[in-house]
């Protein structure tokens, strides 16, 4: 099994915020796929299955406790691979980066996952830029002019993610799909 985790916060007030780009990408994948809904309270999130070996997870624990949901799914399904999609304030809106392992970079969702599951997983980092106040910036909604860039980046990221899942070659995918902004 491959587990793809999109990080975000639940609730209408968080829809279309910078912190929710992981949720947005999962929603984009679901919109274009036949899936089985495996959501169960024990998983602490929305869980979907595509085909025989791909799980998509949107934790419902809020960002700072995302690891609780990821651990519950990993413990139950014994996933061989995990890919986490998240916002990154250290890269500009429109940028896309890939990496495996390493530090959380101060991202509380990643800190939670690292604490409960370790940090040996692939990461898809979607740039959202850095505002004056980090917390309010990541919880702000995208401006209309930013939504155009975001839409293009999410579509590009979807293609990259699908190829990463299929080919399992992070270096090649990073070379082919990374974006600078």
From Swiss-Prot:
UniProt name for this protein: Peptidyl-tRNA hydrolase
A GO CC term attached to the entry: cytoplasm
UniProt cross-references to PROSITE patterns, sorted A to Z: PEPT_TRNA_HYDROL_1 (PS01195), PEPT_TRNA_HYDROL_2 (PS01196)
Entry similarity comment: Belongs to the PTH family.
Marked site: Discriminates between blocked and unblocked aminoacyl-tRNA: 9
Subcellular location: Cytoplasm
Residues that bind tRNA: 14, 62, 64, 108
Residue intervals passing through the bilayer: none
Organism phylogeny: Bacteria, Pseudomonadati, Campylobacterota, Epsilonproteobacteria, Campylobacterales
Active site per database record: 19
EC number annotated for this UniProt entry: 3.1.1.29
